């Protein structure tokens, strides 16, 4: 446990940020999971869920919650899954 006042404050700030980041990551994972579940429904619902997931990944990336390359990779994979599921035949 730190003795210096500023160090004590930094520990408290770190705790608060850890909780916030955990909540934000949980929300991000939930959004992605909802998209994956929506793939079994119609294309319109899945498209809306894909847009929400993409937006959530962009926000998380801009806030430093996930690395920009990680966000780009996940968006790419989600988009590929959507395209494969609802590909136009013929």
UniProtKB/Swiss-Prot annotation:
This is Small ribosomal subunit protein bS20. GO terms for biological process: translation. Pfam families: Ribosomal_S20p. It comes from the Bacteria. Belongs to the bacterial ribosomal protein bS20 family. InterPro entries: Ribosomal_bS20, Ribosomal_bS20_sf. Binds directly to 16S ribosomal RNA. Keywords: Ribonucleoprotein, Ribosomal protein, RNA-binding, rRNA-binding. The keyword RNA-binding applies. One of its GO terms (molecular function) is small ribosomal subunit rRNA binding. GO terms for cellular component: cytosol; small ribosomal subunit.
